[in-house]
Amino acid sequence: MSSRVVDLARWRDPRLGQPREVELPAGTVRYHDQGSGPVIVFVHGYLVNANLWRKLVPLLADRFRCITPDLPLGAHTEPMRRDADLTPVGIAQLISDLLDALDLREVTLFGNDSGGAYSQLVAADHRERLGRLVLSSCETPESSWPPTPGGFGLLKVTAAHPLSCLALYQVLRLRRSWRWHNTYGWLARRPIEPTVMGSYVRPVLERPEIRHDGRKAIGAVSARYTRRAAERLTAGFDRPVLLAWAAEDRVFPLAHAERYAWALGAELRAIPDSYTYIAEDQPELTAALLRDWRQS
C-alpha cells in the first residue's frame, strides 16, 4: 500500500517529458522539459504540480519548449531546505533562480491561479529573462490572497500551526471532497482524474516535510505583495502581456481581469466553459490562444 502512495505522489503524466532535477539555493526542484522553440515556463498554484499542464503541453510542444516545474506549494516531492524563503518574495526568487540555472532567455512566463500572483512578482522584480507574460485566472489588485471566494482564506489561517494544517487536509482523503467548492470544485469545472488528484493531495497528506513547505508558502501570502507588483507593472513593464481568463471563473472574476488588463495596457481574452484551471478545462482553446498571441 505504501509503495502505491509513493507512486501516486511522484507520478507525472509522460506527456510532460522526462522528469529532471535542478539544484537551486532553496533546494532541489523537479521539472519537465518538452518540445523545442521559444520557451514557455508554466507556473502553477497551491496544491497542484506540473500535472496541471499535462493536456496543454502536448498541444504546444511542436512549436514551443515547455518547462513545467513542481514548485514547493504542497504537491511537490522534493522538500526544500528548512531555512528556505517560501514567502511570495522567496518563491519569486526561486522561479528567477530556475530561469538562471537553466539559462532560459526571452521566456514567456505563464502563471495560473496563485502561480499568476508569483509570476507578477517575477515580472516586477526579476524581469531580465522574460520576453512575455501571461496571467491566467489569478490574483489581481482587486483580489485578496488567498482569494476570498471559495473559502480559501482558511488555508492561511490553519497554516499557523502544524496540527491545524494536518487536520484541515484530512478531508482530501475522501474523493467526494475533491468537488467541494473550497477544495478543487471551483477551480476545475469538471472532475479531475483520480491519478492526477492523487499526485496533488498525497504529498501534503503523507509527508510532514512537504506539508511544512506548503504551510510556509500559504501562510506567508498577502495581497500587499500582488498590489505592490501590480504598481510596478502598471508603471512600466515593457514586454507584451496577455490576460487569459476563464469566462465563468468563480474565484477570480472576469470583471477584475478587465480592469487590470486596461491598467496594464494588456490584451484580454476570455475562455468559455472553464473555471480557473483553463489548461485542465479547455486545453485546446488555451493552446490555440497562445499560438495566435505569440504570432501577433
Give the ranges of each region predicted by the language model:
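Conserved acidic functional residues
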Residues: G45, D113, E280-D281
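Flexible "cap/lid" subdomain of the alpha/beta-hydrolase fold that forms the substrate-access gate
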Residues: S3-Q18, G27-V29, I67, G74-E106, ...
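Conserved beta-strand termini and adjacent loop/short-helix elements that scaffold enzyme active sites
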Residues: P25, Q34, P69, I271-D273
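Short, flexible hinge/linker loops that cap or flank conserved catalytic cores
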Residues: E23-P25, D33-G35, I40, A235-G236
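Generic recognition of short, well-ordered alpha-helical segments
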Residues: N51, K55, P146, A255, ...
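Residue-level signal for the nucleotide or nucleotide-sugar donor/cofactor binding architecture
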Residues: V48, K55, L86, G90, ...
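Conserved HGGG/HGGXW glycine-rich cap/lid loop of the alpha/beta-hydrolase fold
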Residues: R30-E78
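Catalytic histidine-centered segment of alpha/beta-hydrolase-like enzymes
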Residues: S274-A287
